[in-house]
């Protein structure tokens, strides 16, 4: 199930959702804890440019397609990141199957494009 939703840019972030049983529902404590995740996921702004360049590089992995989203797997949950332009969304979850991650990522990409 969904644990948290964070909107972020290269310079700031906002927690849009926090499941009530986490961090004793203390949003400030959660924000402090999530800062390290956000700082790490901001690296995606740079790596996205790298992956975009690989799309046109004839020496890169053939037919790998366009970068869409990132999933990080932990023993007790997942972090998923979607970046469009200069903003992104991080989701933390207890678990989802891969098809559900992809469905959510597509929806988030559409939403971010509209912002």
Q: Positions of the model-derived regions?
A:
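Non-catalytic interaction/Regulatory regions outside core domains
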Residues: 1-115
């Amino acid at each position: 199930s969904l644990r948290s939703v964070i909107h972020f840019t290269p310079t700031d972030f906002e927690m849009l959702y926090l499941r009530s049983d986490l961090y004793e529902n203390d949003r400030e404590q959660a924000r402090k804890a999530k800062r390290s995740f956000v700082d790490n996921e901001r690296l995606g702004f740079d790596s996205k440019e790298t992956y975009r360049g690989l799309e046109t590089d004839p020496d890169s992995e053939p037919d790998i397609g366009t970068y869409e989203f990132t999933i990080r797997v932990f023993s007790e949950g997942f972090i998923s990141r979607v970046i469009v332009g200069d903003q992104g969304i991080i989701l933390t979850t207890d678990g989802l199957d891969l098809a559900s991650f992809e469905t959510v990522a597509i929806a988030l990409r559409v939403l971010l494009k509209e912002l």
